[in-house]
């Protein structure tokens, strides 16, 4: 069995003046940093339909995917995240709209008008999964 350095063909291509694209993992889940992980671990197993987009950056082109997104014990996964991982670069932002196509603010205002005693996390829980609503309300310090 011959073991060859997997980078040798790339080095040879460069020596011949060919343009070589840097490789990196793709179609992978994204992990949270420690502080965010602690806050969002209770959401493990929660899935939402989301619009996940990359923010165009120095090395990133704009891309967006409307698919399921799953909170895991380590971060985010699901079809939308696996797709966007091909475009994301470390240090660049991604944006996840977890109620795409809905005006959440208007829906919450309407819920307040229709049922003023309803807790905000309950009203938001009609738009996104209840556990997600509870974490968002607590994390953002929203009351009313």
Regions found by a protein language model. Give the residues of each.
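General structural feature for long, well-ordered alpha-helical segments within catalytic domains
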Residues: 8-9, 36
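Gly/Ser/Thr-rich active-site loops/lids in small-molecule metabolic enzymes
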Residues: 10-20
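Short hydrophobic core segments
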Residues: 1-5, 12-14, 69-72
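An anion/pyrophosphate-binding glycine-rich loop and adjacent beta-alpha core
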Residues: 18-24, 28-144
């Amino acid at each position: 069995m011959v073991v060859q350095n997997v980078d040798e063909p790339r080095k040879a291509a460069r020596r011949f003046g060919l343009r070589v694209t840097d490789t990196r993992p793709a179609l992978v889940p994204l992990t949270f940093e420690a502080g965010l992980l602690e806050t969002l671990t209770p959401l493990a197993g929660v899935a939402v339909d989301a619009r996940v987009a990359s923010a165009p950056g120095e090395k990133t082109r704009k891309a967006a995917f409307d698919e399921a997104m799953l909170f895991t014990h380590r971060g985010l996964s699901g079809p939308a995240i696996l797709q966007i991982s091909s475009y994301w670069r470390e240090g660049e932002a991604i944006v996840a709209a977890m109620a795409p196509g809905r005006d959440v603010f208007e829906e919450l205002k309407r819920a307040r008008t229709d049922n003023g005693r309803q807790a905000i996390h309950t009203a938001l829980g009609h738009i996104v999964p209840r556990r997600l609503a509870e974490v968002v309300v607590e994390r953002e310090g929203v009351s009313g």
